[in-house]
Amino acid sequence: MKKWQNIRKVVLAYSGGLDTSIILKWLQSTLDAEVVTFTADLGQGEELELARRKAEMLGVKEIYIEDLREEFVRDFVFPMFRANTVYEGAYLLGTSIARPLISKRLIEIAKETGADAIAHGATGKGNDQVRFELSAYALNPDIKIIAPWRDWDFKSRTDLFEFARMHQIPVEKDQQGEAPFSVDANLLHSSSEGKILENPALPAPEYVHIRTLSPEDAPDQATRITLGFKKGDAVSINGKNLSPATLLAELNRYGRDNGIGRLDLVENRFVGMKSRGFYETPGGTILLAAHRAIESLTLDRGAAHLKDELMPRYAELIYYGFWFSPERKMLQAAIDLSQEHVEGEVTLKLYKGNVIVEGRQSKKSLYSSELVTFEDDQGAYDQRDATGFIKLNALRLRTLARRCQGNQEKK
């Protein structure tokens, strides 16, 4: 290809799966370029040495496989959860939040190895192409980016299978012996798309679920846990301090066993189309419920309501790929400031797909039992003060009502 004719070395975001293995071979054969592979361990639960062996089989000399789980949760997942972030009221952004970190390392490795370009396996129809590339350009405005799905002649995954067969690239099968769903996974979630899921009228088959038990098959006995928070981040489970990645992995285990975190969603992609995906976010679902509970105790009403107003915009920025944008950083600064006193413990009951808050406590609590009691408050609150409060707040409403009455009388 003429537009890539001067490229001699490319860093490829490589999962070891079918798509990126074909891309690796395509880059080698089409561009005659040396390919460096980068595989990020974000807690996807796969055997990453398999990716190394596949890369070696395809002739790759420089292979990067890095454990980024702690950085992923500490610097990306937790900051996002401080905002109680959900996209379109439901999606916990498990795929979206992983892309900036992968792009960051692609740019760094390109610099370390003297590569001319980076490459990714995102299709030309999806959000990930935008997320990868916006993040990369934010960190290196001059980087060259190769997106094979937008350049090659393959039109479908069937074409990919034929290319793989011709070049003896192994093709994975699902539990039914067929080509697998399009799956993305990390420590926060897993997502499945394609095949039968492309019809939003049909239910997802049970074998699609890879992270959770069915709620019907979950234990009949509830599980109770206590989650500890400091400055808005979860720091402990049942009194035991854990690192960010270890804590999320433990929450995933609790969520998996109790059938928590399944989501069947039709969402609006950034590129303009609607898509249907099936998501499993067991630990994240528990974390969100607990964080909202501790905030309810420690966050001032005005700050809490402002956060709720800002959150959809913040979620949209992450979903669209603007993690490194100035506006996301501005919002993050405000969100982080709001978390200064968000600390304490939340007790949760996990039962057959449900996360039920049973209690919350904090040394920084704004809750006053003296003020809200139905019993004698010993003078903590004078109910007669409410009369003036109501009159002042009703002033404009009464003025408007009188105007309406006057207009009706004139008729």
Curated annotation (Swiss-Prot):
Gene Ontology cellular component terms for the protein in this record: cytoplasm
Record CDD domains: ASS
Pfam families, per the entry: Arginosuc_syn_C (PF20979), Arginosuc_synth (PF00764)
PROSITE patterns according to UniProt: ARGININOSUCCIN_SYN_1 (PS00564), ARGININOSUCCIN_SYN_2 (PS00565)
Annotated localization: Cytoplasm
GO molecular function, a single term: argininosuccinate synthase activity
Keyword match Glycoprotein: no
Pathway note: Amino-acid biosynthesis; L-arginine biosynthesis; L-arginine from L-ornithine and carbamoyl phosphate: step 2/3
Transmembrane segments: none
This protein's name: Argininosuccinate synthase
